[in-house]
Amino acid sequence: ACDILKIKDKQLREYLAMPNRVLRVKIPVKMDNGKIRMFTGFRSQHNNDRGPYKGGIRYFDPEGGVKYMEREVMALSSWMTWKCAIVDIPLGGGKGAIFVNPKKEKLSDGELERLTRGFAYKIAEVIGPQKDIPAPDVYTTGKEMTQIMDTWSKMNGNRYSPGVIT
């Protein structure tokens, strides 16, 4: 992207090359069979110079495993920065993922909700209307975004905050 935009300044290129923050979390989820299963999730926040981070949360199980997923999430958060900048939307780039394929693994609705709320709890300190605004992505919908909003709101004084998600 720096080449296309003809950004020559070496320090600026280095600054834009990596996310500001990548949060890696472990999410314990009580499964329907009573056992606890650990999931790994990420939230990459690439750049917020133009406004709050913005980007999807996906359920994702790449063949390369968790390490590949982390790099993918970092790259996708970068793309969100550039997409918002190109169309002059005052938002930065973010992206999140949980290492799971709910279709292949046939997780129940309850298991998915506990997973989503657990992830929201773990990333709550870095998201919010003025910080980072998650959105649906692969295998997530408005249903999961509502669960994230509800969890975040309960952790922030029970204030109704629809602006925490899109």
Spell out what each predicted region is.
Residues A1-K26:
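Short, Gly/Pro- and small/polar-rich lid/capping loops
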Residues C2-K6, G55-I57, G96, Q147-I148:
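Non-transmembrane, interaction-prone segments in cytosolic or luminal domains
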Residues D3, S78, S153:
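Residue-level marker of positions within ordered structural domains that often coincide
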Residues D9, E70, T141-M145:
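Alpha-helix initiation and N-capping motif
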Residues R21-K104:
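Glycine-rich, N-terminal phosphate-binding loop and its surrounding beta-alpha-beta segment
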Residues F60, W82-T166:
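Glycine/serine-rich phosphate-binding loop and adjoining beta1-alpha1 elements at the start
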